[in-house]
């Protein structure tokens, strides 16, 4: 059954079960980290957008007193590069590792589940934390071999899907008998799903499903 709840809804559900109060920045639907513009060379627009987001996050986090959870690793990677060091910025995997694993009682899945470590997760040095989160949620985590960058390349996977297909040419045979896959970037997950035969979603869904009731 395809998941009906959005990543935001699931994230709030998990955070509240861990005892957190969730605060959203004002005008959140108008905010953007600027990555889509930066990737196309529109650096002034990218910096203007990230500046707006930075201001809103500083206000919402009480000048960095509270940690900030972002929903994808590429956005978080840019934000860490260009925003104030006052902000404690996390993508899902590191936030789960640092702030949720010790607050939630998890029941490991007995199924073999696939995991994809995104390029920006690697750049941020999150491989070990990714593996720790995976092992906390399933007895049989699978990190496919010879699958590095997924080739979605920001939004190029929408317009040049052949790049994505070539980058993931070794994926399907390794995961098509598995029940699901998990990562921390929605565009990567779209390409992974399209080229693997299984559905990839955010690791936050996996944690939600692993919480003991």
PLM segments and residue spans:
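Iron-sulfur cluster-binding electron-transfer modules in prokaryotic oxidoreductases
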Residues: 1-213
């Amino acid at each position: 059954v395809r998941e009906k709840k959005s990543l935001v809804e699931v994230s709030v559900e998990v955070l509240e079960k861990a005892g957190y109060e969730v605060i959203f920045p004002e005008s959140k639907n108008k905010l953007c980290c600027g990555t889509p513009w930066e990737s196309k060379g529109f650096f002034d627009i990218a910096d203007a957008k990230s500046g707006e987001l930075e201001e809103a996050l500083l206000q919402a986090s009480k000048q960095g007193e509270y940690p900030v959870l972002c929903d994808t690793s590429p956005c978080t990677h840019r934000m860490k590069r260009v925003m104030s060091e006052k902000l404690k910025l996390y993508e899902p995997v590191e936030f789960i590792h640092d702030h949720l694993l010790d607050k939630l009682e998890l029941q490991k899945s007995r199924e073999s589940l696939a995991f994809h470590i995104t390029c920006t997760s690697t750049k941020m040095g999150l491989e070990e934390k990714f593996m720790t989160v995976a092992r906390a949620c399933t007895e049989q985590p699978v990190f496919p071999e010879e699958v590095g960058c997924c080739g979605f390349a920001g939004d190029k996977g929408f317009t040049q899907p052949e790049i994505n297909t070539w980058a993931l040419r070794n994926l399907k045979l390794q995961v098509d008998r598995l029940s699901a896959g998990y990562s921390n970037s929605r565009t990567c997950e779209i390409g992974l799903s399209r080229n693997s035969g299984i559905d990839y979603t955010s690791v936050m869904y996996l944690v939600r499903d692993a919480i003991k009731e």
